């Protein structure tokens, strides 16, 4: 990430759920696919919503949209969940969300997690192969929970929902292009 991400995160967002006085918004971003674990997130969110007024927005498109929308209705949380699809500027959502969730079953390098941290959003992520455990120092910049454990995910979401913003910004900077270039140059300087 860089200055462009930060600038785009400050762009206006015309969404009524982010108006002052509204319940906190929990955000997830990704392809609507089994890999992303949004089915687990919906179940966890239903437990959060039972105790704390909140809303869930899942940005992205994919083949599981209909199934996920049906699941939300079946859980009785349909009015508190939105699937806006693909949006050109997810950073405006990330900078305003109360919490970002990465519920994946597996990942490569989860860019959306790093971007959410760069936007100052508190995060909860699953301990899926490749990524979150290497990015988040559990308890410091966010929380890590077991994959597919909606009880643990819900508990972490409840704990993190009112966490102050900005805890992961410095850690996210270590994944910026400038940091990668600096690390590469240091490695070249040390080479024989």
Regions found by a protein language model. Name each.
Residues 98, 120:
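A short alpha->beta transition loop at the rim of the catalytic pocket in nucleotide-sugar-dependent
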Residues 86, 105:
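Aromatic "clamp/platform" in nucleotide-sugar-dependent glycosyltransferases that forms part
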Residues 137-150, 158-163:
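Conserved acidic donor-binding segment of nucleotide-sugar-dependent glycosyltransferases
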Residues 115, 128-139, 143-144:
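Short acidic/histidine- and often glycine-rich active-site loop of Leloir-type glycosyltransferases
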Residues 122-126:
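Short hydrophobic beta-strand element within catalytic cores of glycosyltransferases
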Residues 5-20, 25, 166:
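A short helix/loop element that forms part of the nucleotide-sugar donor recognition site in Leloir-type
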Residues 165-191:
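A charged, aromatic-enriched C-terminal amphipathic alpha-helix characteristic of glycosyltransferases
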Residues 20-32, 38-83:
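A conserved nucleotide-sugar
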């Amino acid at each position: 990430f860089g200055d462009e991400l930060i600038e785009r995160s400050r762009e206006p967002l015309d969404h009524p759920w982010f108006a002052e006085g509204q319940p906190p918004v929990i955000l997830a971003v990704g392809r609507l696919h089994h890999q992303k674990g949004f089915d687990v997130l919906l179940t966890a969110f239903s437990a959060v919503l039972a105790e704390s007024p909140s809303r869930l927005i899942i940005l992205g498109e994919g083949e599981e949209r209909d199934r996920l929308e049906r699941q939300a209705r079946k859980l009785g949380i349909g009015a508190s969940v939105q699937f806006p699809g693909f949006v050109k500027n997810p950073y405006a959502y990330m900078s305003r969300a109360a919490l970002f969730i990465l519920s994946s079953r597996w990942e490569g390098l989860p860019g959306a997690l790093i971007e959410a941290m760069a936007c100052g959003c508190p995060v909860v992520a699953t301990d899926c192969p490749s990524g979150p455990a290497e990015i988040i120092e559990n308890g410091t910049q966010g929380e890590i929970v077991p994959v597919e454990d909606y009880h643990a995910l819900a508990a972490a979401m409840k704990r993190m929902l009112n966490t102050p913003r900005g805890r992961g910004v410095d850690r996210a900077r270590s994944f910026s292009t400038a940091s990668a270039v600096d690390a590469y140059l240091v490695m070249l300087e040390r080479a024989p």
